[in-house]
Amino acid sequence: MTGSWNPTSIIIPVTLSFLLSFIHNFADVVAAPTRHLCLPEQRDALLELKNEFEIGKPSSNDYCYRNNSRVSPHPTTESWRNNSDCCNWEGITCDTKSGEVIELDLSCSWLYGSFHSNSSLFRLQNLRVLDLTQNDLDGEIPSSIGNLSHLTSLHLSYNQFLGLIPSSIENLSRLTSLHLSSNQFSGQIPSSIGNLSHLTSLELSSNQFSGQIPSSIGNLSNLTFLSLPSNDFFGQIPSSIGNLARLTYLYLSYNNFVGEIPSSFGNLNQLIVLQVDSNKLSGNVPISLLNLTRLSALLLSHNQFTGTIPNNISLLSNLMDFEASNNAFTGTLPSSLFNIPPLIRLDLSDNQLNGTLHFGNISSPSNLQYLIIGSNNFIGTIPRSLSRFVNLTLFDLSHLNTQCRPVDFSIFSHLKSLDDLRLSYLTTTTIDLNDILPYFKTLRSLDISGNLVSATNKSSVSSDPPSQSIQSLYLSGCGITDFPEILRTQHELGFLDVSNNKIKGQVPGWLWTLPNLFYLNLSNNTFISFESSSKKHGLSSVRKPSMIHLFASNNNFTGKIPSFICGLRSLNTLDLSENNYNGSIPRCMEKLKSTLFVLNLRQNNLSGGLPKHIFESLRSLDVGHNLLVGKLPRSLIRFSNLEVLNVESNRINDTFPFWLSSLSKLQVLVLRSNAFHGPIHEATFPELRIIDISHNHFNGTLPTEYFVKWSAMSSLGKNEDQSNEKYMGSGLYYQDSMVLMNKGLAMELVRILTIYTALDFSGNKFEGEIPKSIGLLKELLVLNLSNNAFGGHIPSSMGNLTALESLDVSQNKLTGEIPQELGDLSFLAYMNFSHNQLAGLVPGGTQFRRQNCSAFENNLGLFGPSLDEVCRDKHTPASQQNETTETEEEDEEEISWIAAAIGFIPGIVFGLTIGYILVSYKPEWFMNPFGRNNRRRRNTTTH
């Protein structure tokens, strides 16, 4: 029936609706505990923790890494609010049953501050994961960290934490991951760390840890990842590390380990990466390492290893990266190396490998991309089998002894992937630049420095046009006499070094038409000028904005500094030193004030004063050995990035620039040989490492506390990694240099070590006592106070200068004894105490017994075994000298009285007789030679 009622049509939908509603409500009931589990005391602790730190404001350029992805910093704690569920806060994970916080991830949260022992963090007793990576937290880790006994992961890397690892760390017995890298932790690794038996990952790299690695580290049987590089560990590598059978990654680079690699490392058959480079390891590499068949990376570079590379090294069949450069390996290069299929990088440069080269029988295309075997003792030619390395991108065979046979450059035409070729200092025949460039269609960098290169300006003999892909070309020391015209077509050229040649004439103007040229080194040639702007390719008509580094030192340039330089608006480094430029420094260089970081105009004939309104971005300014006059411009105070200021050997007439102490980055100050005068005011130079104000007219006394705030010379070792040499300079392209009096000689520092410290106040008119505060400069290497008027005693505090190598206090007015404490300065190789008023026992230290006698001469009464030893026949003990002198004086006094008596009586008789004659007779024979007329003549002559 149409329109009749069907009960099922209503029952079914109602039933379904009821079921859906029931399921939904049931789900809410079940899910409710996971959404509202925040415990009030946990929330309060987190909010208090939030207030313990400052939150920075990252800029758009700041970034950090999370899960190997680059992300922007994010202030995680800003989203924490009192009126919301803390288990839903960012960075918080709660236990689903108890509601307690078990994970706290505040990595990359821009937090500042330090932990206190009563931090609210330690109230989160059930915390399992704590990640504070990549913040700016500092201070020590309080021992209260040991209260978080449930921790399994503790990650504090990339902060500013310092001090020791707290001993309470051993309470974290459940810890599986401990990451403390890239902080300032110091001291030794506590041996109790060996009790953390669940540890699988230990990351302590890039800190200031020292001492020996505790052997207890071998107890961490679950460890798979151990990273300790870039610290100050020393001693031998503990053989107990060989017990870590599960270890897959072992990083020990950049420390001071000595001795051999433990043979027990051969037990680490799960090892994939072994890095022990940049230490002081020696001896043979244990043959047991050939057991590590899973090894993909073996890094042994920059040590003192000896012996040969085993022929069966191909047993390491998974090796992808083998680096053993800068050692003392001998023997031949095993051709079996080239039979390791996965091998991508091989670096054996700077060893003593010898013999002829054989690259083996390569049956299939090699995966090798980097073959670096230069600076050895190989002889012969380059094997033609090199062409089989079809994936090769970098090849370095510098210093190959080809026995004066030519190099077959056609080999390289088969290497379609070759990007970087280094063949410097071969003993080959002349290389014709015009002939070889056509072989390189894809090459971007070519180094043939130190070879005899012909660059005759002619058309290429090859039918192929020369490559136009080269971006970097090294032609230093090639005996070139004419600028290579073939470079004119190298439009991709960005880096060109033609230094140390014999190129004469003008620097060609077409150079400036190369649109990508950013580095040009013309130093040590015989150039006379830059091509005039009136020429066809003159400097006024070309684009020059790409030039960043220009070196033209030690040539024959004359006249004024060319004004075209002012148009190099991107210029970062300008070195025109050791030429014959005259006139003043161009004012147009003001156009470079925002880009120029390094300006070296040393050893020219420049005159006038230093400009007042340029160079505000400078990091290094050297105008020494010119004819500059006037005063130091006070505008220097605005050079906030200035690290080096050298104005030596000019005619600057000014008082001491105490106001330079406001330059917080100033490290080198040289005012030597000018006309500076007056007292030197007390000033704070927190980063100053080298100061030379010698040979001026400074006077007055030095305040007792003068050196108290010279912190860089006092505690340099705390701030610098002295295990690896670092030099002052702007990256790869420029390194500062200077001349300094050291050990009595003028020593040229071609590069300035960042840990080098020196103080030279010699050749002035200082008086008074040497300040006792000089003993605070514990990092000082050179101290020269000679040729002044210092008086009083040499301060015994100088005995604190434990790093001192050279001490000169000669030509002063010092009195008293040489402090016995100086005898304990084991590095003091040179000393000079001469020309003072010193007396007493000379210290008996070994270094004192190695000096020349002249170091002690012209004093009042120095004596002692040390002096007897260094002077030997030249020296008579002071006490004996005094006795001899007194006896001689007594004898001379007796003789004088006798002589006086002998002459006295006849003298009286003669005097009375002459007096009688003068009064009575005045004879003419007497008056002519001795009388009035002669007196008149003498008076006239005198006037």
Swiss-Prot record:
* Topology term for the membrane: Single-pass type I membrane protein
LRR repeats span which residues? 124-148, 150-171, 172-196, 198-220, 222-244, 245-267, 268-292, 293-317, 319-340, 341-364, 366-389, 390-414, 415-439, 440-463, 467-490, 491-514, 515-537, 544-568, 569-592, 593-617, 619-639, 640-665, 667-685, 686-709, 753-777, 778-801, 802-825, 827-850
Extracellular face of the membrane: 32-897
- Transmembrane regions: 898-918
Q: Please report a single Pfam family linked to this protein.
A: LRR_8
Q: Where is the signal peptide?
A: 1-31
| Compartment(s) | Cell membrane
Key words of the record = Cell membrane, Glycoprotein, Leucine-rich repeat, Membrane, Receptor, Repeat, Signal, Transmembrane, Transmembrane helix
Q: Which GO terms describe its cellular component?
A: plasma membrane
Q: Which residues are glycosylated?
A: 67, 82, 118, 147, 171, 195, 219, 222, 291, 312, 354, 361, 391, 457, 521, 524, 556, 582, 605, 653, 699, 784, 800, 832, 852, 882
Query: Mainly localized where?
Result: membrane
List the ranges whose topology is Cytoplasmic. Answer: 919-943
Presence of the UniProt keyword Cell membrane in the record: yes
Please report which protein family the annotation says this sequence is part of.
Belongs to the RLP family.
Protein name (Swiss-Prot/TrEMBL): Receptor-like protein 35
Give the species.
Answer: Arabidopsis thaliana
The organism's lineage is: Eukaryota, Viridiplantae, Streptophyta, Embryophyta, Tracheophyta
